[in-house]
Amino acid sequence: MGIFDKLKDVNEMRKQAKQIELQLANETVSGSSSGGKIKITMDGNQAIKSVEVDAAVAGDKSEVARHIRSALEDLFKHHKKMLQSKFGNMMQ
């Protein structure tokens, strides 16, 4: 394989990466803490789109922190499932 063939392959990979990035930008996933006190939504490229906080926990810093952690764990679990369902064959 010559250098021009390798460059062609690199350019093709860049195109594919850009297409995947565009596809992921159109996907959204959400995660919420137990009890739904905090809900976080992001796109498939992991850009946070919204954070919703129930007023019932807003005044308690330690409870807010606990709920944020729980919501983020749930969010990334859903994000991983979305990636596996869309691109599972590419992730092996």
Regions found by a protein language model. Give the residues of each.
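Long amphipathic alpha-helical segments used for membrane anchoring, targeting, substrate engagement
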Residues: 1-30, 71, 77-92
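Residue-level signature of catalytic and energy-coupling elements of molecular machines
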Residues: 10, 46, 68
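N-terminal intrinsically disordered, cationic/polar leader segments
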Residues: 32-34, 40-50
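A short interface-forming secondary-structure element
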Residues: 47-63
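Short, charged, low-complexity patches
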Residues: 61-72
